Amino acid sequence: MRKAAALASAAMAAAAVAVVSTVLHQRQRRAAKRSERAEAVLLRDLQERCAAPVELLRQVADAMAAEMRAGLAAEGGSDLQMLVTYVDSLPSGGEKGMFYALDLGGTNFRVLRVQLGGKERRIIKQDSEGISIPQHLMSSSSHELFDFVAVALAKFVASEGEDCHLPEGTQRELGFTFSFPVKQKSLASGTLIKWTKSFAIDEMVGKDVVAELNMAIRSQGLDMKVTALVNDTVGTLAAGRYVNHDTIAAVILGTGSNAAYIDHADAIPKWHGSLPKSGNMVINMEWGNFKSSHLPLTEFDQELDAESLNPGKQVYEKSISGMYMGELVRRILLKMAQETRIFGDNIPPKLERPYILRTLDMLIMHHDTSSDLRTVANKLKEVLGIEYTSFTTRKLVLDVCEAIATRGARLAAAGIYGIIQKLGQHSDSPSTRRSVIAVDGGVYKYYTFFSQCMESTLSDMLGQELAPSVMIKHVNDGSGVGAALLAASYSQYHQAESADSS
């Protein structure tokens, strides 16, 4: 009797456990479905807010062109600085000789040597060396910093081979890429406005960076001088023009973003100097600071901007560049984790850490073509410490990456279209004239989806008639080789030869 009662009791308990288990399982399934529905709503809302149809992109391009004209009309007339670079002549391909470049823009700098052989041989030989800047020199003095640079430059010059020696009496010439804000006064002169990127040498602000470098070079006994002071965007334009004379503009799509282009000097009202012989002038747009009510920005863009070191500034750059796209994805995933069960019941602690998800991580996930999206899973585990994710979650993460990358690529295309539109008013026959846009930077170079989307969007904006006449070409290392090419283009010896032959 007792045994039967015990068996009955056990059966009842098992049945109760089964019922409870079934109820819990049903609740979990209902919760999972509710979470999936909420995730789908959030994704759809994101996609709608990031949508950039061609009609909207044309409005963005119109606004870009209008801001360009306003920036050219007067200093401070636009959010675009539209800086006159004093570069009025770009490499032709006929330059000959050996030229140097110094690329200083962060915690490392590079020195380059380029041997040019004219139109037939072009770049014969190219050497470069990268050097790390000790931390203490970033806040020491201009004298110590530039002396360190000059010592490295002198060692690099000393490594010239027999085939690199200059003719007797010839001075070495250097193109200087300085990627900090400067007020340029001539092609080879510019005063530092402020430091960025961990540099803090206060006494250097307001000084001529070229004069400081030339002085340090002389102290090393080097017979060398700076021929051209440029930034990486202008260098990319020079490198693009060197290989293709139809190059009209250059765009950098990397950690940051910028553009430069060739305009008619008489289309620059704020230019008060004598018109250059070429009739042209390269303009450094500083287009990252562009803003417009037509930009399809989301709450995530607004929050990122408000919490950035420069709120209200570089709004366009914050939607298209490598510094920020990965962070936008992180912010979106964090909101999804807070409002749904995308990553389970708890929010992954690392997901709350700003800038932990880089655009490099984003592009690796976005390029995952495996059937189970294993690369996405591995990245989420590696970067955010998320041990397990379902296929649905991985697909959602990929879709978020696609929404941000697509918007960024389409907005970058709109910026390029704005430049073409601005120049169109000076083109005799824009439908038949071939135009090349030189592009460099890690986002363009490595984020294949981004670059392809940007190019196809630009074609859509141009239309069937104009699209074949505009080409985007990747130009590698404009900040290095481009600077050396500008040194060659403005060589005192090249100028003398031109004068003799005229």
Curated annotation (Swiss-Prot):
InterPro entries: ATPase_NBD, Hexokinase, Hexokinase_C, Hexokinase_N. The chain crosses the membrane at residues 5-24. Gene3D superfamilies: 3.30.420.40, 3.40.367.20. Induction: Not induced by glucose or fructose treatment in leaves. GO terms for molecular function: ATP binding; D-glucose binding; fructokinase activity; glucokinase activity. It is found in: Plastid, Chloroplast outer membrane. It is an enzyme of class 2 (transferase). CDD domains: ASKHA_NBD_HK_plant. Its EC number is 2.7.1.1. It comes from the Eukaryota. Pathway: Carbohydrate metabolism; hexose metabolism; Carbohydrate degradation; glycolysis; D-glyceraldehyde 3-phosphate and glycerone phosphate from D-glucose: step 1/4. It catalyses: a D-hexose + ATP = a D-hexose 6-phosphate + ADP + H(+); D-fructose + ATP = D-fructose 6-phosphate + ADP + H(+); D-glucose + ATP = D-glucose 6-phosphate + ADP + H(+). GO terms for biological process: glucose 6-phosphate metabolic process; glucose metabolic process; glycolytic process; intracellular glucose homeostasis. Keywords: ATP-binding, Chloroplast, Glycolysis, Kinase, Membrane, Nucleotide-binding, Plastid, Plastid outer membrane, Transferase, Transmembrane, Transmembrane helix. The keyword Transport does not apply. Residues 231-477 are annotated as: Hexokinase large subdomain. It is a single-pass membrane protein. Expressed in roots, leaves, flowers, immature seeds, endosperm and seed coat. Residues 92-230 are annotated as: Hexokinase small subdomain. ADP binds at G106, T107, N108, T255, G442. Fructose and glucose phosphorylating enzyme. Belongs to the hexokinase family. This is Hexokinase-9. It comes from Oryza sativa subsp. japonica. The gene is HXK9.
